[in-house]
């Protein structure tokens, strides 16, 4: 088992990076391989998964990200690809707040997570994620958004804005009343690009 790999990023592809560690190339599946730059020296914190026909390495920028991945793997019905997709969603604080406040509906916005799996995540992880975020209480307003606003916030994160930036404008967008997803995105872009 490997705790971390330090080396030079040689390959960046959809879903993984190739890291050269002293002449040995490791393929490491990551939530967002495009966070890395080719030919940069970096450290990737890894989790090795052994299956009947495959040994895979999953890598993360921080130890906290890897620990969250490990917690998600303990949920019945969540495999490495689903856990990676959840982390790739970039909304760690929203995920933690939804679990800690018992709001499975919010979790269905992550790829591959339906109602049943979302309920299982809340059931299995509630009370076990407090060490990942100290600011859970202020996140409650995030959980009371309309589906349109939730979709718009997720789209803004997908466009490259950080979850922190998007969560900061959430109250302003929510105060606008009921709008379409497109309208929320347009208003959000204006607020974020000021």
From Swiss-Prot:
Region (Flexible linker) location: 139-143
Region named Domain III: 144-194
Compartment list: Cytoplasm
Gene3D superfamilies membership: 5' to 3' exonuclease, C-terminal subdomain, DNA helicase RuvA subunit, C-terminal domain, Nucleic acid-binding proteins
Annotated keywords: Cytoplasm, DNA damage, DNA recombination, DNA repair, DNA-binding
Region (Domain I): 1-61
Family annotation (InterPro entries): DNA_helicase_Holl-junc_RuvA_I (IPR013849), Hlx-hairpin-Hlx_DNA-bd_motif (IPR003583), NA-bd_OB-fold (IPR012340), RuvA (IPR000085), RuvA_2-like (IPR010994), RuvA_C (IPR011114), RuvA_C_sf (IPR036267)
Subunit structure: Homotetramer. Forms an RuvA(8)-RuvB(12)-Holliday junction (HJ) complex. HJ DNA is sandwiched between 2 RuvA tetramers; dsDNA enters through RuvA and exits via RuvB. An RuvB hexamer assembles on each DNA strand where it exits the tetramer. Each RuvB hexamer is contacted by two RuvA subunits (via domain III) on 2 adjacent RuvB subunits; this complex drives branch migration. In the full resolvosome a probable DNA-RuvA(4)-RuvB(12)-RuvC(2) complex forms which resolves the HJ.
Similarity remark: Belongs to the RuvA family.
Entry remark concerning the domains of this protein: Has three domains with a flexible linker between the domains II and III and assumes an 'L' shape. Domain III is highly mobile and contacts RuvB.
NCBIfam families per record: ruvA
Protein name listed in UniProt: Holliday junction branch migration complex subunit RuvA
Organism for this UniProt entry: Oenococcus oeni (strain ATCC BAA-331 / PSU-1)
């Amino acid at each position: 088992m490997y705790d971390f790999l330090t080396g030079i990023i040689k390959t960046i592809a959809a879903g993984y990076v190739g890291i050269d560690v002293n002449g040995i190339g490791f393929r490491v599946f990551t939530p967002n391989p495009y966070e890395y730059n080719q030919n940069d020296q970096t450290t990737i914190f890894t989790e090795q998964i052994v299956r009947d026909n495959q040994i895979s390495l999953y890598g993360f920028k921080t130890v906290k990200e890897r620990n969250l991945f490990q917690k998600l793997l303990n949920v019945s019905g969540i495999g490495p690809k689903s856990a990676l997709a959840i982390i790739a969603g970039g909304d760690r604080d929203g995920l933690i707040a939804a679990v800690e406040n018992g709001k499975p509906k919010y979790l269905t916005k992550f790829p591959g997570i339906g109602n049943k799996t979302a309920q299982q995540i809340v059931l299995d992880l509630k009370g076990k994620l407090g060490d990942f975020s100290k600011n859970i209480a202020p996140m409650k307003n995030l959980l009371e958004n309309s589906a349109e606003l939730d979709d718009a916030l997720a789209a803004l994160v997908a466009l490259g804005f950080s979850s922190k930036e998007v969560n900061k404008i959430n109250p302003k967008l929510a105060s606008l009343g009921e709008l379409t997803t497109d309208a929320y995105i347009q208003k959000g872009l204006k607020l974020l690009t000021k």
